[in-house]
């Protein structure tokens, strides 16, 4: 007779065997497969469903939903409020996405942002995705957020262009990085910021000038472009050139953006312009334009220095990606193509950007990156993975939790 204690041990051992077999089971591909993608690295709760109906064509987007935390009154993102926002919105958004895509019973792969990002925000999406992976007995891929930005320009051509190797300027509110990518799992960081990101700097400068919203830099760009010639051209700001490669600062292959905020405040004080709301629009437009130009000039100058100081790395590189929230800025795109497209031996002939609606954080890029990871590397994630606050792209596969999914 088997004792209750022995029965419990027997059931537990058999459950563990089933669990190992179930979650080490490879993806059983039909002709195609469907992907549920989740992104919660900052203040956007994003859910999408992609139909990978064929490996020879770009996936169809069956659903794409986003709900952004309203942080206008706070003047910035409060991590605890972002965490609560994700907890409140991730369930309803996922339910809507599954209904819209008619995929409630047909999800084959779950892709979710693992990092980098705000730990509380990341955990909201990652914990939810792991729960679904257990409930549905489906494989999980914890995706690098910046890899999503880097790869999303490839989705429209089903990964055909840009072809590896290529370089990427990843510009957002949390990152400013120049990367050389030789393969999906081979990335070299060539230039990174030593303080804040370009999007953060532009947002804070915009806030100093009285702009409001959840995307302040974009509001400032719109204001500048309303009438680019309606400026006070006599109003000249003294703007910095951070980490300039002078005799005392050789080979400073880094970005720095905090100085622009300080410089703007100093200029406003010198000009006696402390009450922004009292300034004429043409003066505000002139100040905003000069700030934006100075920030973008800094990026261009640093990119030129990287390209000229290490020409051997770019011998066979002729494709340039610019992605991330700030990549939607048309002035930045124009400056990149004008100034980097004519650099002699390091000229880039092809420039690639995401569609405008996929420049900012979204879950489609997470789903596409997961598709590329699985189809190229045959990798999935363990169920014990945790959020990663800081995760350099060059350490993509060195973190724990990856395993091979054998067909």
UniProtKB/Swiss-Prot annotation:
Swiss-Prot/TrEMBL catalytic activity: L-threonylcarbamoyladenylate + adenosine(37) in tRNA = N(6)-L-threonylcarbamoyladenosine(37) in tRNA + AMP + H(+)
Outcome of mutating residue 145 to A: Severely impairs t(6)A37 formation
Binding of a divalent metal cation, residues: 145, 149, 361
Consequence the record notes for mutating residue 134 to R: Severely impairs t(6)A37 formation. Prevents dimerization
Cofactor binding description: Binds 1 divalent metal cation per subunit.
Transmembrane segments: none
InterPro entries: ATPase_NBD, Gcp-like_dom, KAE1/TsaD, Peptidase_M22_CS, TsaD
PROSITE patterns: GLYCOPROTEASE
Effect of residue 130 to A: Severely impairs t(6)A37 formation. Partially impairs dimer formation
Ranges in coiled-coil conformation: none
UniProt xrefs under CDD domains: ASKHA_NBD_TsaD-like
UniProt xrefs under Pfam families: TsaD
Outcome (variant: residue 77 to E): Severely impairs t(6)A37 formation. No effect on dimer formation
Disruption phenotype: Loss of QRI7 leads to the formation of mitochondria with abnormal morphology and no DNA.
NCBIfam families: gcp_kae1
Function according to Swiss-Prot or TrEMBL: Required for the formation of a threonylcarbamoyl group on adenosine at position 37 (t(6)A37) in mitochondrial tRNAs that read codons beginning with adenine. Probably involved in the transfer of the threonylcarbamoyl moiety of threonylcarbamoyl-AMP (TC-AMP) to the N6 group of A37. Involved in mitochondrial genome maintenance.
Misc note: Present with 1400 molecules/cell in log phase SD medium.
Name this polypeptide is given: tRNA N6-adenosine threonylcarbamoyltransferase, mitochondrial
Classification lineage: Eukaryota, Fungi, Dikarya, Ascomycota, Saccharomycotina
